[in-house]
Regions:
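N-terminal Rossmann/SDR dinucleotide-binding element
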Residues: 1-68
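Conserved beta-loop-beta element that borders a ligand/cofactor-binding pocket
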Residues: 115-116, 148-173, 183
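Short-chain dehydrogenase/reductase
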Residues: 89, 126, 132, 137-145, ...
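C-terminal substrate-binding subdomain of Rossmann-fold SDR/epimerase-dehydratase oxidoreductases
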Residues: 193, 198-342
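Short alpha-helix in the Rossmann-fold core of NAD(P)-dependent oxidoreductases
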Residues: 74, 84, 89-96, 112-115, ...
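Conserved Rossmann-fold NAD(P)-dependent oxidoreductase catalytic core, especially the SDR/UDP-sugar
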Residues: 97-139
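NAD(P)H-binding glycine-rich loop region in Rossmannoid oxidoreductase-like domains
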Residues: 55-91
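Active-site Tyr-X1-5-Lys
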Residues: 122, 135-162, 190-191
Length: 342
């Protein structure tokens, strides 16, 4: 079985590609490679077929001999999505619909879409399930809602989309990100001795280890198609819902000699949501998470220490997606629409 993984050289994609190849799948990766040279751990998969192309330039020929699609490629978080709202719409929504249409035309039935729990937006204190009202507050979250709606309308006996609404990922992957909350808190603790919280610490977020997230994609790929056909699944565990300040407390227990510091820079951030994961636990039997946040914080701390992560590296372009893209724009390596310049 040959799987097309878009965004395979990103944080989640680099982990998912490894997991798929380790299980014996054929994998074709498609990535525009904005983050080339930003590796945390060197990796090379000789059995991987790589297409170096912008998702917006995809053609039907790129889908030849593909049996299923896992679509990760996107401007990949809320701050990045606000860089250019129109561009976020073009890459995250329009390119997604185009890819799904080409996949359907090519007879590819399984289409697994990387959605996000961020679409719940401001959800209060009650746990939200897949059928709860959506309240996206950022361009990124809106693009996920619109993409789900469009792909759902395309579903029929020949095309079976499924929507994996991911919790906030954490943990070590070959293409590390330090702009995700747990990875970021550990980075501040390790490089400065201060666990820097930019809000008042009260917002809720669900968290999931990047490996567990990859395993969820594989469980979805391997289960009976009738179980996941045109379904949305929140991806995570009930016990992994945390307030930001509770995440910081875990980091404080693990990283020696650090203390919590509140900066209130993002005090206006209204996003908060507790998520129910009953559906994935009961219906996607192949999904069995291996991690929890404390285990993940230990992994991050040990990896940062072994790597010798410096403050400049941690806060620079390499592991912060928005910084890297701004750097490419400033150097005129990419144009204003994020296409590579010739």
């Amino acid at each position: 079985m040959n799987i097309l993984v878009t965004g395979n050289n990103g944080y989640i994609g680099s982990m998912l590609t490894k997991l798929l190849l380790d299980k014996g799948y054929g994998v074709t990766g498609l990535d525009t490679n904005y983050y080339r040279g930003c590796e945390f751990n060197s990796f090379h998969y000789p059995q991987l077929k790589q297409i170096n192309k912008d998702i917006r330039a995809l053609t039907k020929k790129d889908l030849e001999n593909i049996d299923a699609v896992i679509h990760l490629a996107a401007l990949s978080n809320d701050p990045l999505g606000e860089l250019d709202v129109k561009l976020t719409y073009e890459i995250n929504y329009e390119a997604t619909v185009k890819l799904a249409s080409l996949a359907k035309e090519s007879g590819i039935r399984r289409f697994i879409y990387a959605s996000s729990c961020s679409m719940y937006g401001i959800a209060g204190k009650e746990a939200v399930a897949e059928d709860s009202p959506l309240a996206p507050v950022t361009a990124y979250a809106i693009s996920k809602v619109k993409s789900e709606e469009a792909l759902s309308k395309m579903a029929d006996e020949n095309f079976s989309p499924v929507f994996l609404r991911a919790s906030v990922a954490y943990g070590i992957a070959p293409m590390l990100r330090c702009d995700l909350v747990v990875n970021n808190l550990v980075g501040w603790a390790y490089t400065t001795g201060k666990i820097r919280i930019m809000s008042d610490g009260t917002p809720w977020r669900p968290a999931i280890h990047v490996e567990d997230l990859g395993l969820a994609y594989i469980a979805c790929l391997e289960c009976q198609i009738e179980i996941v056909h045109n379904q949305a699944f929140n991806v995570g565990q009930d016990k992994e819902n945390y307030q930001i300040r509770d995440m910081a407390s875990v980091v404080k227990r693990v990283v020696p000699g650090c203390e919590v510091e509140y900066t209130y820079e993002h005090d206006s951030d209204s996003r908060t949501y507790i998520v129910s994961f009953d559906k994935i636990a009961t219906e996607l039997k192949g999904f069995s998470p291996r991690w929890d946040i404390e285990k993940g914080v230990w992994q991050l701390y040990k990896a940062y220490k072994a790597h010798g992560l410096t403050f400049d590296e941690f806060t620079g372009n390499k592991y912060i997606r928005l910084n890297q893209l701004k750097g490419l724009i400033q150097k005129k390596t990419v144009d204003e629409k994020l296409f590579w310049r010739a």
